[in-house]
Amino acid sequence: MPPKAPCKECIMKKIIIIGASSGLGERIATDFARAGWRVGIAARRMDKLETIRNLYPANIAAAEIDVTAQDAVKKFYDLIELIDGMDILLYAAGIGFYDPDMEDERVTTTLDTNVTGFARITAAAYKYYKSTANRTPGHIAAITSIAGTKGIGVAAAYSASKKFQQTFINALEQLAYQQQVNVRFTDIRPGFIRTPLLDPEKEYPMIMSVDHAAPLIETAILKRKRVAVIDSRWAIVNGLWRLVPQRVWRHISLKW
């Protein structure tokens, strides 16, 4: 069962970040903690989470959560209780591969994290907000990708998984309206960002640093934007390629 809503006297804002052990999740977690938020961080690498927690021990709580495991929801709810509530969930966990050979292990690993794990945690967050809807306005934010707006052959599992995330958010939003659950949604769609997800030896078009992308993502979350493409250059590219019909798109060779 979802945990109870926090007490009315607990005025410190609270955010839980899934996938906070490195990259964007780590940076956003430390930024929110520095700003005075109570931050719950979760990932599989507890040693890395402890290092981050020690930067702001009064503001950060850490939990080892593998989103692909059956106990992920229980541990997620335990983390909500540990920080006494959740104003925002940010799902920043993700994995993907350049995989033109469609290797089975890479495909299944991608789908386990980006589809099953994502649905498991965001659905649990929705249930939490539904159980506390009259007292605690909710916000579910997720870092998806512009890759979710088109099928990308050399990263088929990744792009399809990101499309799933975007559609799942849309479906939850509709459900929230139908059930009158007070929760907002933010779909964050970045282009290439230099994080451990990418091959450090490769060059990528219009690649962004974490220092550049993180503040843009944080602004989108705090302003509760419904969809935010990161950054403006990628917004233009994304707008253009969405206009390309599939009969043309299938002939385009994307390589990186």
Write out the residue ranges for each language-model feature.
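C-terminal helical subdomain
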Residues: 187, 202-238
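Conserved NAD(P)H cofactor-binding loop of Rossmann-fold oxidoreductase domains
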Residues: 92-98
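Rossmann-fold cofactor-recognition segment
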Residues: 56-71
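Residue(s) in the substrate-gating loop at a strand-loop-helix junction
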Residues: 145
